[in-house]
């Protein structure tokens, strides 16, 4: 192989082309590659941050859900306790009212019994006086009659 002027010319042209490319073409290509690499790295970082944020948000949502369930259970428990308390209060009020009505009824019964006893005593006294008058055949005066009825009522 002979080195001739054509080969030297081609080598010089290639060297000029390489130098031109290194001076004017290569820097923008390298800059574009670096920018693209930076965008890709930023995108990956953003994706990682988004994944972490999503995980944190899911954990926070889960925690809030657990707290809400606990609060709901607590509210339900308090409601059950309050309902039981209200039922017990109503029972106690009903018991007190029943005792009051019972005591009032017993007092009325006692009063009716006493008035019936008094009426019966008066009738027994009148019958006793009437019987005594018939036996004795004479009339007893009103004062003696009242005294006799009071004595009999006290004895009965």
Swiss-Prot record:
F(1)F(0) ATP synthase produces ATP from ADP in the presence of a proton or sodium gradient. F-type ATPases consist of two structural domains, F(1) containing the extramembraneous catalytic core and F(0) containing the membrane proton channel, linked together by a central stalk and a peripheral stalk. During catalysis, ATP synthesis in the catalytic domain of F(1) is coupled via a rotary mechanism of the central stalk subunits to proton translocation. It is a single-pass membrane protein. NCBIfam families: ATP_synt_b, PRK05759.1-2, PRK05759.1-4. It comes from the Bacteria. GO terms for molecular function: proton-transporting ATP synthase activity, rotational mechanism; proton-transporting ATPase activity, rotational mechanism. Keywords: ATP synthesis, Cell inner membrane, Cell membrane, CF(0), Hydrogen ion transport, Ion transport, Membrane, Transmembrane, Transmembrane helix, Transport. Belongs to the ATPase B chain family. The chain crosses the membrane at residues 12-32. CDD domains: ATP-synt_Fo_b (cd06503). F-type ATPases have 2 components, F(1) - the catalytic core - and F(0) - the membrane proton channel. F(1) has five subunits: alpha(3), beta(3), gamma(1), delta(1), epsilon(1). F(0) has three main subunits: a(1), b(2) and c(10-14). The alpha and beta chains form an alternating ring which encloses part of the gamma chain. F(1) is attached to F(0) by a central stalk formed by the gamma and epsilon chains, while a peripheral stalk is formed by the delta and b chains. Its main location: membrane. This is ATP synthase subunit b. It is found in: Cell inner membrane. GO terms for cellular component: plasma membrane; proton-transporting ATP synthase complex. InterPro entries: ATP_synth_B-like_membr_sf, ATP_synth_b/b'su_bac/chlpt, ATP_synth_F0_bsu_bac, ATP_synthase_B_chain.
């Amino acid at each position: 192989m002979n080195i001739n002027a054509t080969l030297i010319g081609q080598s010089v042209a290639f060297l000029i082309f390489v130098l031109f490319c290194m001076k004017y073409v290569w820097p923008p290509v390298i800059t574009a590659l670096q920018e693209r690499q930076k965008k890709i790295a930023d995108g990956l970082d953003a994706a990682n941050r988004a994944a972490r944020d999503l995980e944190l948000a899911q954990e926070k949502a889960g925690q809030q859900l657990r707290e809400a369930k606990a609060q709901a259970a607590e509210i339900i428990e308090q409601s059950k306790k309050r309902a039981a308390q209200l039922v017990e209060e109503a029972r106690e009020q009903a018991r007190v009212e029943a005792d009051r009505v019972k005591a009032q009824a017993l007092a009325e019964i006692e009063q009716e019994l006493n008035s019936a006893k008094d009426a019966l005593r008066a009738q027994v006294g009148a019958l006793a006086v009437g019987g005594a008058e018939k036996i004795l055949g004479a009339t007893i005066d009103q004062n003696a009659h009242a005294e006799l009825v009071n004595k009999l009522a006290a004895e009965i």
